[in-house]
Structures are given as structure tokens and as C-alpha cells.
Amino acid sequence: YKRQVAYLNLLNKNFSETKTYLAKVNSTSKEFQQQKKVIEILLEIFEQKKISDSFENQLMQKYASILNYEYPKLPEDVYDYSDEDDQKMNLKNVILDVLGNRYFLQGDKGKAFLIHNEITQLGSNPDWAIINDLDKLDKKSNKTAFEKYLINAKVKSSSWDWRTEKSTDIQFKLSDYLADFKGTLYLGEMKFDLAKKEFEKIDQKYHTSESAYFVYDYDYTTEKESKTWVENQFDGYHNIPNKIFGYNKIECFNCDENQVIATPYLNEFKFIKPKMSKLELTNAMIELNKIAKKNTEEAAKANYLLGNFFYNTTTLGYYRYLLTFDRNNDNGPKFNNYGDQYEATSNFFYKSFGWGGNYVDNFTPSENYLKKAFDSTKDKEMKAQILFALSKNEQGRFYNAKDPVLKRLYENQYDNEEKILAFKVANYRSNFKNLKQYSDTKIYQEIKSNCKYFDYYTNNF
């Protein structure tokens, strides 16, 4: 009873009463002593008007063993931790939850984030306020013991060693991660010079995931699984293929890159390397952008490649992982952003920050480059190629549409299928309509063969 009254007083911020009742809890039971200790630690945190540097150092002096606690490795065939182990972990988590909330409320967004998340979770919902606060923390010369603890515990990327088949951590500097993060955001915003400036700060050995691993394939006819060792894959920073400037002939995320992506005009730009780091990619885009400003056939091709890049890196594109801080284009939560209303994970702290990725596609950069390419070229084959690329962006806009008429039609989709199709044709098929004028081109026939949407359109409208 006295323990419960002490806890209720704590929640009501009656700290003197909390201390009075806690002093009366004299049971020698391990469970009671553990619960009493939890309330004592929470009381110590609650009494702080602000979590200061001196208090952070004090926390680590008194409670380092609690904060550094990790579950022990279980023996083979044992699947549950002991009650004592669970109590230790619960105590650690309670302390971190309270601290996370306090940091959130006092505006220390960087530490509020790191308490509950590995740094790479920032890629699920990029937030400049958190990024800038982490940048201040990184540049702070006299970090507290608790700040050092957070950086050491959270600035890493959980990975899998495919050779040993064991989980592992990839360690890197906070400054490298933040420069990569900011540079990637700038790249998506077409701020190429700012992106380059950030990428130049990075140790070029930096990476956040493995570049070599097994690819598994299941043969349903033989009912056997095979695995192939692949190397030089995207590792979060390196090995970006030059095909990122190509276009996808077919819609298939799990198909081989060579089967999906075609690369017209790419070999005319020798400065684009076959595999690139983000810095090398940015340098190539800066050069392409310079050429794209002219009014020549070469400029048209440069604009076309840039337009492809910005479509390919939307969540509809084959290389959707690049600007979303993902490892590959598998169907992860960051790419399920159509049809649902995004909800913030919490209004109290940043726990579970990685759930519910929030990426809203912007098709304007791709469309602007492609329209410039269309206006700059006299080549009919290329014009047809560009219209097909524009039609993909137009389809993306259809997915993004918040049109109230369309929303009402979808409320009874089964009965309104014909009306939905008519709405789509009237409002989101202008590039298909224009592409029909290029039926005498080679690329037109290729598009009809590969894209069943377009094939259906040409046969019915």
C-alpha cells in the first residue's frame, strides 16, 4: 500500500509525499526492493526542472550498470529470460522512456530520438529539427558521459554477416552519417552543390550495410532453394549503378536490373561511371545539369537522363531505395505510402520512430527535366521515349490524387469501375494520348509490347 501511494504521489508531482511513503517501504522482498528502486530513480529524474549536463554525468556515475544492461545469451533450447533479467531490462527501459519524454518536452530532439532509436531509423521519417539537433550534439566539444553513452549505443547500423550467419553492427561516425543524410536530402531537392559539399565531408570508406550477401531463389518446379553470392551491391553509400539514369521497360521490383532497365543515350556521357558513390553520382548530376541548360540534342539527352533519375528514385521507381535511406527496393514499409493517411508515431517521445515511413512522392523534378528534353529534341524516337517517361509520372500523380470526386467513386469501387476508368482517361492519360501520335516509331511498338496499360489504351481509346 505504501509503495503504491508513493507511486501515485510521484505521478501527481507530490515529491515530498513520495519520499515520505517510500521511506516506509521496508520489505526485504527482492520484488519490492526493485520496485522501490524504480520509484527512487524516477523521483530523481522528475525532480529535475531540466535534464542538464551535470545531471547527465550524475546519471552515468550512479546508474551506468543499469543503462548498459543487455540480456545475456540464452543457452541452447532456452527461449525465455529469467524474471530477474526481465526486471533489470524493464528498469532500464523505464528510465529511458522517462528521459526520452523529458528530452522531447524540453526540446532536445536529438537525444530524445537517440534514446529510443538506432540512428538509421531517422531514414523512416526525415526530420530536419532532429538532424540539426544531432548536428549540434556531434559538434559539442565537452560531451557528457550520457551523451557519449547514447552515441556509442545508437550510432550504428544493425546488419547481418552472411558468411558467419550472425548479426553484427556496422559502426561509423555520427558526423559521417549526418553528412550522408543531409547530402541525400539535398540531392532529392536538386540542391546539387549543397549535396556535394556534404558528401565531401564523409570518410569514403563509410557504409551502413553489407555490399556482399547471398541472394536466395526458390524453384517451385523442383521445390528446391538455391543461393548465389553477389558482391559490389549498394551499401548505403557506394555501388550505385549508372542504370539509375535509365528507364524501366517493365514494372518488376524483384526482377534482375538488366531485365527491367534500359539505358538509351547513357553511353554518350563518359563521365558517368558504371558504379558510383553518392559523391560520384552527385558530380555526374552536376555535369549533366550543366549540359541540360543548353538547347541542343545533347541537352535533351541530359535532361532525359535526369528526368529518369528523379522518377526512378520515387517510391514507384526501381531505385526507390536511394533517396529513402533503404538498403534495396524490396517492399518495405517506406514504400507503402499510397492510400493511407500518415499518422505521427507519438506526441510524447520518438519511440517506434521507424514504424510508418512517410515518403510522399514529388513528380515535379522528373516532369520538368523531361519536358525540357521534349522541347529540345527533334528526334521522333526520343520524343516518344520522353512521353512514355512522362506518362509514368502522370500515373504517379493519379496515385497521389486527393480529388474528392475520385475519392467518392472509390467508396464503391466495384460499381464505379467504368466511371473510375473514364475519370482516369480524362485526367491522367494526356501523355498516352500524345504518344499515340508517334505510332510510326520503333519505341512505340516496344512500349506497346511491354506496357499493358498503354496497349489497352491504344486499343480502346
Model-predicted segments: where are they?
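Extracytoplasmic/secretory-pathway proteins
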Residues: K2-F461
